[in-house]
Amino acid sequence: MTVDYKNTLNLPETSFPMRGDLAKREPDKLKNWYEKNLYQKIRKASKGKKSFILHDGPPYANGNIHIGHAVNKILKDIIIKSKTALGFDSPYIPGWDCHGLPIELKVEGLVGKPNEKISAAEFRQKCREYAAEQVEGQKKDFIRLGVLGDWDNPYLTMNFDTEANIIRTLGKVIENGHLYKGSKPVHWCLDCGSSLAEAEVEYEDKVSPSIYVRFPAESADEIEAKFSAQGRGQGKLSAIIWTTTPWTMPSNRAIAVNADLEYNLVQLGDERVILAAELVESVAKAVGIEHIEILGSVKGDDLELSRFHHPFYDFTVPVILGDHVTTDGGTGLVHTAPDHGLDDFIVGKQYDLPMAGLVSNDGKFISTTEFFAGKGVFEANPLVIEKLQEVGNLLKVEKIKHSYPHCWRHKTPIIFRATPQWFIGMETQGLRQQALGEIKQVRWIPDWGQARIEKMVENRPDWCISRQRTWGVPMTLFVHKETEELHPRTLDLLEEVAKRVERAGIQAWWDLDEKELLGADAETYRKVPDTLDVWFDSGSTYSSVVANRLEFNGQDIDMYLEGSDQHRGWFMSSLMLSTATDSKAPYKQVLTHGFTVDGQGRKMSKSIGNIVTPQEVMDKFGGDILRLWVASTDYTGEMTVSDEILKRAADSYRRIRNTARFLLANLNGFDPKRDLVKPEKMISLDRWAVACALDAQNEIKDAYDNYQFHTVVQRLMRFCSVEMGSFYLDIIKDRQYTTKADSLARRSCQTALWHIAEALVRWMAPILSFTADEIWQHLPQTESARAEFVFTEEFYQGLFGLGEDEKLDDAYWQQLIKVRSEVNRVLEISRNNKEIGGGLEAEVTVYANDEYRALLAQLGNELRFVLITSKVDVKSLSEKPADLADSELEGIAVSVTRSNAEKCPRCWHYSDEIGVSPEHPTLCARCVENVVGNGEVRYFA
């Protein structure tokens, strides 16, 4: 009768499931985290530690979250959790940007425009309610990602206290002398009826008319004399400009040239024209005239203040000098309309050029505009061309496709238009140079971010912070009704208004009667009706939120982390405001991530149908797979996502989960309080495995500390798949299953597995948060009660390295891994040739040189356990049979033969020692010892 020895084996057992079933299980985890107030437990556990503050850039409270939002929040969460594990107190307060045009437009669609069907006060309340709904919807999705934070107390830019603090930030800007009012060209959206911030402008291709226009000389004789070309050439004499915005011609007030460029008087067909010397040929080609003759040359400097007739109005305009004039295109003479271009405005100011003021807020020409009254600017383009043709001053017209600024919200072309606005001056108090100096004090990740924002700061115009909108933080200023000067008590008045806003929100300003605060001054001062640019709202949160929330303890902000578009957005506005108010950058480090694209590198788009939503990913794969994809992707460039890529992430996840399950299953029956083996008593291979984990942990900690999350994933995978999966965990199965349950051989192994599991779960937690929590709940209890959640814990301190006197050091085991790899290769060939079934059916002979023989001899009879074969002989390489193929590992050769011995039904090894015990005639001697004796003794493996 056959005896079943199954109950004498230590078979692995765990309730930790093989399948993650993440989409189903994760919501229950979240419920548990929030019922047990996990975030506050982390705060309590971290109290008193050194702080690390990552300040959340507020997403806009409108619409569902997209994959880019998910990437952003997951990266932040990985950093917060890893910093906690590294021993920092790292609070996370999520935020939302709640004012501004997109919300206004949504609410307009629901209830109509303010002051039409609904009062402005009611409209603001509707905007507030809409934003609150959007916040709640986005919040649920962010929480579902496994992101931990103070979700019950987020910061909203529409919170009354935040609105009040934004007003106080404006006060500091004024106090430090950075605010001024001026009429200046700003980006103006005709659909918004308002100015736009730099970050609200997108460049798209647009087809525009391209025209070459004649400005006839007031005195041809005077111009001939300047060019020393008296009596030369024939026909009328004109300066030629080129433009793609014909509608700006009515506002022309000058022609700009570069003082240092050479200009030619050219016979062009039957007329004489002035062109930059470098552009004569290209202009002649563009207008289709072959006959050209150079009549004279001068520097631009010599043309200054020469006068030319406006092409269709009855006045003349001067030639002025400007450094912005180049020979990159056009004619080298630039049509100058100070109302409609920043360079034009700046150079116009130097020459005291008048502002035309012909275009109203709705983008139409005012009633006094000759020829074009009441026409929209783009509608006027063909009319201007027609007028130029009519008066004989159109040299050439064609269509051109070029990059043109568009409104980010309406996707429609915008214009430059001079309007009275409030500005933060880049030069007023040296703000530009100070900001450039502060940029150099910041760590930029990746480092090219520094050059990018430096260039933007070097070239950016003054910041127009005023908007003509209803839903926004008001510019709570009082100005003189005649002089427009600020009230002398502006700072005190701002604080008084801020206190009221703190109690009642921004509506307190609109409800305020001037007399309440100004008394008799209300006769001569009025309230400013403008609101603040929303980039001022979010840009001031370093002060309006972080400096005022108790969780941050008044500490400086360590990091801002957003998409790479925020160099000109939130990073820029925050830098400008913090430098203006506090003379320093608001952050020590700035990390940017790339945009998400599909598997073919294309931007996500509804029209292409390639949008991957985080909701779909979580429903199909689970949050941990999405998190693993984010972590394993190099965020410094474009982040590619597709179903195929997510499936690969799921495969990687399974390997990690299987490793964790193996550890837990083999810790069955292990009680660290009772069974832990001291390092010096452990078996060599087990000590090496723990040391291996320590090496991995050091690399993983360093990678987390430097935000190299793809390195963390790679190191985690190498540890699970290579060092553990294909070597250590494979080798220990025999010892784990077959030795006596309480033997040193088994407890040593379990001790190693326990240390490794304690470390592994902490490495995983910042990335695979749901799974790490699941593993944590299955780990054996320790002497001191295990913390309820892994997220309150620091990286594991119990790992140890190999001692200096360790005979079988890491170099030894690395060599052995190479030998084992070669033996496995030869075994695989034998398996494929049907010479053997499994490795235990084989008897292996290793022919080795002296170095390898000495190496292998150190394991004695335990070498077979490392090679996972029933019998191993080691012989001198000189004894290698002539017909035995050379090994791929220099210094050894391997031969494999099928064992003729019997197979032990308990350990499955083939042995000549089966039947040595009459009581157990089918068992090998080793199994007899493990079943009824004191148990086999292992030293090395």
UniProtKB/Swiss-Prot annotation:
Disulfide bonds: none annotated. One of its GO terms (cellular component) is cytosol. One of its GO terms (molecular function) is zinc ion binding. GO terms for biological process: isoleucyl-tRNA aminoacylation. Its main location: cytoplasm. It catalyses: tRNA(Ile) + L-isoleucine + ATP = L-isoleucyl-tRNA(Ile) + AMP + diphosphate. PROSITE patterns: AA_TRNA_LIGASE_I. L-isoleucyl-5'-AMP binds at residue 562. Binds 1 zinc ion per subunit. A motif ('HIGH' region) lies at residues 59-69. Keywords: Aminoacyl-tRNA synthetase, ATP-binding, Cytoplasm, Ligase, Metal-binding, Nucleotide-binding, Protein biosynthesis, Zinc. The keyword Cytoplasm applies. The keyword Nucleotide-binding applies. Coiled coil: none annotated. Its EC number is 6.1.1.5. It is found in: Cytoplasm. ATP binds at residue 606. Its cofactor is Zn(2+). Zn(2+) binds at residues 904, 907, 924, 927. IleRS has two distinct active sites: one for aminoacylation and one for editing. The misactivated valine is translocated from the active site to the editing site, which sterically excludes the correctly activated isoleucine. The single editing site contains two valyl binding pockets, one specific for each substrate (Val-AMP or Val-tRNA(Ile)). HAMAP family: Ile_tRNA_synth_type1. Catalyzes the attachment of isoleucine to tRNA(Ile). As IleRS can inadvertently accommodate and process structurally similar amino acids such as valine, to avoid such errors it has two additional distinct tRNA(Ile)-dependent editing activities. One activity is designated as 'pretransfer' editing and involves the hydrolysis of activated Val-AMP. The other activity is designated 'posttransfer' editing and involves deacylation of mischarged Val-tRNA(Ile). Belongs to the class-I aminoacyl-tRNA synthetase family. IleS type 1 subfamily. Monomer. This is Isoleucine--tRNA ligase. It comes from Haemophilus influenzae (strain ATCC 51907 / DSM 11121 / KW20 / Rd). The lineage of its organism: Bacteria, Pseudomonadati, Pseudomonadota, Gammaproteobacteria, Pasteurellales.
